[in-house]
Amino acid sequence: MNISIIVAMSQNLVIGQKNSIPWNIPKDLSWFKKHTIKKSIIMGRKTWESIGRVLPMRQNIVLTRQKNIKNTNVLFVNSISKAIQSALYKNEIMIIGGSNLYNQMLTSANKLYITHIEKYILGDTYFPTYDHLPWKIIFKKKIIEHEKTKNSFYVTFKILKKIT
């Protein structure tokens, strides 16, 4: 079983601001969909609330201590081990956020799927530092977002695999 993390982050490791994503990058949404479709996705409650709906064609698993949350198309669990055991798609389980879950799962992950927004963005939620761990880049593609405007910036899509 492979555990992977998928994340979009700014140059200063920001992943969120006031329980939402502080950017709108359609190619990042396509990247996210491509790499999570037909997989089990595990997220924290705040991430679930910020998304606001079930992500289709995926098994949605939400990690929470709250007992009163219900949705027939979502599995709510109270521990990471239960989330992983409950995953129907064992080939690759995707951790999709938020910050607390990323912190807990970073050392267990086999792969990181990163959208790196190459600019500094204000935020209140961060991805943990990860460059101290043994990763190897197995995919990298750089694009320009908003190319024809003065607000253009680079976005790099990367897949890192843990060196074992």
Curated annotation (Swiss-Prot):
One MF annotation (Gene Ontology) recorded for this entry: dihydrofolate reductase activity
Alphabetized UniProt keyword annotations: NADP, One-carbon metabolism, Oxidoreductase
Gene Ontology cellular-component terms listed: cytosol
Coiled coil (residue ranges): none
Class in the EC hierarchy, top level: oxidoreductase
E.C. designation(s): 1.5.1.3
Gene3D superfamilies, sorted: Dihydrofolate Reductase, subunit A (3.40.430.10)
Binding residues annotated for NADP(+), in chain numbering: 7-8, 15-20, 44-47, 63-66, 96-101
Known function: Key enzyme in folate metabolism. Catalyzes an essential reaction for de novo glycine and purine synthesis, and for DNA precursor synthesis.
Name of the protein in its database record: Dihydrofolate reductase
Organism: Buchnera aphidicola subsp. Baizongia pistaciae (strain Bp)
Organism phylogeny: Bacteria, Pseudomonadati, Pseudomonadota, Gammaproteobacteria, Enterobacterales
